[in-house]
Amino acid sequence: MKNISILGLGNISFELCSALVQQGFNVFGSTDNYDRQVILKKIGVKVFSRSNIDQCILKADKLIITVPPDNFGCKIIKTYSKEIIDSNVRWIGYLSSTSVYGNYNGEEVNENSKLRPKESLEINRVKAEQDLLDFGTKYSILVEIFRLSGIYGNNKNVINQIITKKVKPIYKEGHYFNRIHEKDIARVLCLACANQMNSGIINLSDNLPASQLDVLIYAYTIMNKSMPKYINYSDISNEMSSNLRRFWENNRRVNNSLLKTKYGNLLFPTYKEGLKSIYHSYEMQS
């Protein structure tokens, strides 16, 4: 069977749904975003409102859950466990985040690393992951947890920020983070749905942890632009929002060896290949 329902059609939904449709899947999904509904219906996605998630589940033999957790864990499992049990669903993919690892002061983390969440969202993500894993074990449903690094793609990227003058170069010594291109997310999830054999936890992250400054320097270089002077993190941290400060206070290098073993090489192994591709597409449009 090739019926997949995506609960929570968010920012990566067009890329993901396009890839699934091209692979011959019947794609269903839930969102109340009208503009997104219109776009996705045009490529063949059957879209349900959030009030009809139960109907969306019953169409599927595979589920992808992107809905963020609440204070009690996974909202979908808490609310719709009966519908999932009564459906033909035999595999669930859950999109989590590498933020569950917390701060490792620049050290490397892998799927077996101890989780050190401090903020409520990260703590709730850990609860949600465990909800899914326990549910899968209890009802013999394969569950695969994908911990995503920072997502970028043709719409959300530093090149667009540079063009729209919304970028502020910040430097913090020894600070690393990983990212993942939305096309790589779509490719991996397509393979996971097609195989329907994997379970457990996997980091969905690129090969090269890097500082924000390294990424910006490369972006300005390929655009042949001069980068403005950077600001030291210590000089601006007190002015940051709590969300932005959280990003800078968490520091880790994510190992993606398991990802490559299970799903092969990435389309965009590092930010360099990804930004080159994005900038080329911008040039083609201009």
Task: Describe these PLM feature segments.
Residues 13-14:
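N-terminal Rossmann-fold NAD(P) dinucleotide-binding loop
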